[in-house]
Amino acid sequence: MPRGLELLIAQTILQGFDAQYGRFLEVTSGAQQRFEQADWHAVQQAMKNRIHLYDHHVGLVVEQLRCITNGQSTDAEFLLRVKEHYTRLLPDYPRFEIAESFFNSVYCRLFDHRSLTPERLFIFSSQPERRFRTIPRPLAKDFYPEHGWEALLMRVLSDLPLRLPWQNKSRDINYIIRHLTETLGPENLSESHLQVANELFYRNKAAWLVGKLITPSGTLPFLLPIHQTDDGELFIDTCLTTTAEASIVFGFARSYFMVYAPLPAALVEWLREILPGKTTAELYMAIGCQKHAKTESYREYLVYLQGCNEQFIEAPGIRGMVMLVFTLPGFDRVFKVIKDRFAPQKEMSAAHVRACYQLVKEHDRVGRMADTQEFENFVLEKRHISPALMELLLQEAAEKITDLGEQIVIRHLYIERRMVPLNIWLEQVEGQQLRDAIEEYGNAIRQLAAANIFPGDMLFKNFGVTRHGRVVFYDYDEICYMTEVNFRDIPPPRYPEDELASEPWYSVSPGDVFPEEFRHWLCADPRIGPLFEEMHADLFRTDYWRALQNRIREGHVEDVYAYRRRQRFSVLYGEMLF
């Protein structure tokens, strides 16, 4: 390979990343217009388009590099020099951290995810830690209550770029002050002030004002979800001021925010104070930089692995028929490998399973489906694998494993946030906790269905409970669109013997679902059945599901709230907003 090409290749990769992130910002910048026009279908399409941008631009760069090198193979020394030149381009580059991830992606595409070593890739960042901690320009504006909180909030809302009229701005300001007074007390509130992000965070049908409530005793989140009425008038639906509430809003089971972030590292650093429980990977994920979030997630895994003496074990819960799931006992992720062969009742292919996971990645997850990171040729040290798990891997997924002596390589896997399986949770709780879990499960089903997602397999074992007590779906192999399902009533038996027969007396076609049957497995436990009948009996009715289908087919997009209904101002303070 001719010398001098290394710099050209490094520059080509960085220019390719520039093009990708420019398009990323372009799609993101359209969020305000989509919100103001209430074009919710365009919101959903923009979310999918933005996710696809990264892989598309990686592919373009790979083709450019093949042209530059005339398709010639490259030796290890040449690749090391390319990385060296690329590293020299980064000190003055504002999005250096994501540019490193883009380099990794191009390398993996060129070499089929092989030879993934720290010498060839940016396994850890090449840049000093201070670059992540320095915010080069203000990302937020401070507001002080010199003339009281009513005047302060009027300035905050008047500063917003939204061009729609307010339904009743004074009412909303009074609601916020009332909430803050109840939360902090009048004296603390008078000594507090706000710091508000310059950019709004758009997601679904809301524009979120994200800020920090700086009080004498510490800094709290300050989150205002701004919605619009059917008449196109703005209103604030609630005010959230706890880290737990903020964590749910920025949760791993939600779609990525559209927030204009030319300096993503700076925004992540600014958010860290109000989201102390979130990892760096989760913060990048929340603002839509999902590929760099994957890099950070892998780094978090490596750091944990270096500091622990644990071995991977099979994850707790009922063993899956499609996925083999394992974990490190102290690490909050699970690793999911598609089995070589599925249980007989699972009539599907591995390609179908991967397509289902991609559907979830691109769809609105409404806070009820866990996000995943997909890895290829994932290397594990054998010393980190328990003998029982190694035996299970070779038994269930041998075709996806390459033995390298002291290591194994798993050809393909997913990494996902670990939760307590709902079936285990229900065995361990009682009283109000049990009631809350059943309410959450039913709400998860409803919200998924309203977002045009039918889980397929609704057994409790396919759902998990987060640290905030939310129920989240995580088994995607039978997932499909609501509009693809044929919901049917079970026909009455022709003869008394029909009900005793081992086979149904009626025909069943692919896609047929009988909601009456849900009762058999969801209400079998006498502790759970009465609660389910009380709160979610309509899930057993065909007309409920068909009505949802009709709304979806008519183009209706449901509101999605990242907080409880009882937290809405209309419920707290009594006035219906629309």
From Swiss-Prot:
Function description: Bifunctional enzyme which can phosphorylate or dephosphorylate isocitrate dehydrogenase (IDH) on a specific serine residue. This is a regulatory mechanism which enables bacteria to bypass the Krebs cycle via the glyoxylate shunt in response to the source of carbon. When bacteria are grown on glucose, IDH is fully active and unphosphorylated, but when grown on acetate or ethanol, the activity of IDH declines drastically concomitant with its phosphorylation.
Active-site residues (renumbered): D371
Name of protein: Isocitrate dehydrogenase kinase/phosphatase
Family, as annotated: Belongs to the AceK family.
Entry EC number(s): 2.7.11.5, 3.1.3.-
Catalytic activity: L-seryl-[isocitrate dehydrogenase] + ATP = O-phospho-L-seryl-[isocitrate dehydrogenase] + ADP + H(+)
Keyword terms: ATP-binding, Cytoplasm, Glyoxylate bypass, Hydrolase, Kinase, Nucleotide-binding, Protein phosphatase, Serine/threonine-protein kinase, Transferase, Tricarboxylic acid cycle
GO CC list: cytoplasm
Gene Ontology MF annotations: [isocitrate dehydrogenase (NADP+)] kinase activity; AMP binding; ATP binding; phosphoprotein phosphatase activity; protein serine/threonine kinase activity
The keyword Hydrolase is assigned to this record: yes
Lineage: Bacteria, Pseudomonadati, Pseudomonadota, Gammaproteobacteria, Enterobacterales
Signal peptide start-end: none
Name of one Pfam family that matches: AceK_regulatory
Gene field: aceK
Subcellular location: Cytoplasm
GO BP term, example: glyoxylate cycle
Residue numbers binding ATP: A315, P316, G317, I318, R319, G320, M321, K336
